Amino acid sequence: SDSDLRWIIDPLDGTTNFIHQVPVFSVSIALMEHEEVVVGVVYEINRDECFYAWKGGKAMLNGKEIHVSLMPDFNSSLLATGFPYSDFGRLDAYLEVFKHFMQHAAGIRRLGSAAADLAYVACGRFEGFYEYGLHAWDVAAGAFIVQMAGGEVTDFKGENNFIFGAELIAGNNPAHREMLKVISEKFNC
C-alpha cells in the first residue's frame, strides 16, 4: 500500500505451549512507521501482564515504568533462549553457545514465547535472550520494548538486522556484550 505504517502482529506467540496447555503464551503487536518500530505491545495472557512502549516514551508493565536489569556480572545473569525449529545446519554452533552459557551464567530458561522472553528482559527478570530462526512477528514488539527499557538489541553480527534477519540477541549492556562476543565467535559471524 501507499501507507508508511505497517502492523506486525502475532496473535498467539507460543502456539505449541497453548496447544499443550503450558501457560506461557502471549499476544505481540508492533507498529512500524517508515521501517522503524514506534509502538510495541506484548500481552502475556495468563499472567495478565501488558508490556508496552512507544517512541519518545517509556517502557511500561501494567502502567508502571520498567527497566532492564542492572546486573553487572554475567556469571550471575539469568538468560533465556528458544530452540530452533529449522536451519539445523547451525545446530552445532547453537549447542556450543548453549553449553558455554550453561557454564558461565547463573542459568538458562526456555519459555516457548520469544515475545514473553523479550518482555522479561525489558523488566529485568532475565538479563539476556538469544535465538535464531525467528520471524518479525516474534520479535518486533518485544525488541522495541527492550530498547525503550534501556537494553541492547542486535543480530548475531552486532548489527540492527534483528527484526527481519531471523536472529536476535537482547539484554542489558553487560549481558548483551558477553552474549554477542560468544555467539559471533561460535557462529563465525
Where are these regions (language model features)?
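Flexible, acidic active-site loops/lids enriched in D/E/S/T/G that coordinate Mg2+ and/or position polar
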Residues: 1-33, 41
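N-terminal subdomain of lithium-sensitive/metallo-dependent phosphomonoesterases centered on the IMPase/IPPase/PAP
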Residues: 1-12, 152, 160, 174-189
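A short, glycine/Asx- and small/polar-enriched loop/turn
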Residues: 1-5, 74, 122-125, 163-165
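Conserved G/P- and acidic residue-centered "switch" motifs that form tight phosphate/ATP-binding loops
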Residues: 15, 44, 146
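Acidic beta-strand-loop-alpha-helix segment within the catalytic core
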Residues: 29-118, 165-189
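Hydrophobic residues within well-ordered alpha-helices
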Residues: 119-122, 143-148
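Alpha-to-beta junction loops
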Residues: 123-128, 151-152
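Short beta-strand and adjacent tight-turn residues that come in two discontinuous sequence segments
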Residues: 131
